[in-house]
Amino acid sequence: VHDRQVGTRLPSQPGKGYHRDIPIGPNGAPHLQIACVLNETAVFCTPLYTFVRFAGTMEFSGRNLKMRPARLRQLTESGRLFFPGLGTARPVSEWCGLRPMSVDGLPIVGPLPGVDGLTVATGHGMLGLTLAPVTGQMIADQVLTGVQGPEDLSPQRFN
């Protein structure tokens, strides 16, 4: 449900993220056993079958899905800082997508003021999948028991 459809406005903006999938092999990505974070460059590396996904960046450029080659190269260059053997294999896929970001950096989770029966969970930014289990538990607790989650995450904090 778009916030304008229910007569309220949640202060958020899109944050564009990118990923580039590099095949595993002598001229490609290393064979990683587990996912890792390249903290210095904020790039996440996830082994997925026959390739490693290099993901990250946050670009505030409105609601557009134009892929910027420099952002994609940044992912590979970050990988090379930590994996010097990362070759020049062509990526098997490249992607960008928009993540909902709240204006204060915290997720927006809880009942929407003025709209009975509507609970929202948005604004997680780069941590959407990471925070999905705990967010789901919070929503389930709120709906089933009426116990509200932290005020810091409530949509009412913007009123």
Segments from the language model and where they lie:
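C-terminal lid/capping helical subdomain adjacent to the catalytic/cofactor pocket in oxidative enzymes
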Residues: I108-N159
